[in-house]
Amino acid sequence: MGVTVDVTFKSLNKYSEILCGDTVECLKTEDSDVIILADGMGSGVKANILSTLTAKILGTMFLNGATLEECVETIVQTLPICQTRQVAYATFSILQIFNNGEVYLVEYDNPRCIFLRCGHVVELQKYKRLVKDKEISECRFQVQKGDALVLVSDGVTHAGVGKSGKYKFGWPWESVAEFVSEQCLTSLSSARMAAALCAECSQIYEGKPGDDTTVVVARIIDRKPV
């Protein structure tokens, strides 16, 4: 039995910023769904440009069969250099879910993907390697009906920094995963899970996000014939 993917993404802009510095691309191939989350350095217009370029480059090259090395090299050569910091920087996660349930996950400097089965967090066995001097994590695994995969930008794990509440040093990944796990047990909807996680981030930020905050939720459901 094949699977299909119910995907929802939602973002909170950094307080007072018009543009979001995170970009999400959802693409389809003949046999898979590809989800890309890119987070540009900083915030506002510059971050938006960095993340948009990164997501578009990864999506276009990935779909055309380019290797991961070729994708990363192109990003490094293409992104505009920040005049202040003298670097071009954007983090990213790539999640490719095949119709047969196979998954390929690539992560560069983003918070770890949260993988849930029966509402419980499952640790993923990842392999790290250097690609153009950047440490990239890769993972291949199998999903089944009812599983959920959650990608987040670091605005989620930074929620609460500088505030006086419980998470004044940030919202730990483990606590984020626990929250998502509880949501997964009570809802089969990716939209509800994404909305709940974003709402919780906003509450922790006291309504004034200190960073661009993006959540992507992918629920695995039965593949239905058209």
Model-derived features: positions:
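DG-centered beta-turn motif at the end of beta-strands
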Residues: D39-G40, N110, A148-V156, D212
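Primarily the active-site beta-strand->alpha-helix module of PP2C/PPM metal-dependent phosphatases
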Residues: T23-T78, Q142, V150, G162-A177
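Short helix/loop capping segments that flank catalytic or ligand/cofactor-binding pockets
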Residues: V45-A47, L116, V152, A159-V161, ...
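Acidic loop->beta-strand submotif enriched in PP2C/PPM serine/threonine phosphatases
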Residues: E17-E30, E123-G162
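Juxtadomain coupling helices with adjacent low-complexity linkers
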Residues: V121, H158-A195, E200
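Regulatory cytosolic signal-relay segments
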Residues: M1-I18
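Catalytic core of PPM/PP2C metal-dependent serine/threonine phosphatase domains
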Residues: I49-G119, R129, I136, T186-R223
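Small-residue (GG/TT-enriched) beta-loop-alpha framework at ligand/catalytic clefts
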Residues: F92, G101, I114-V143, L149, ...
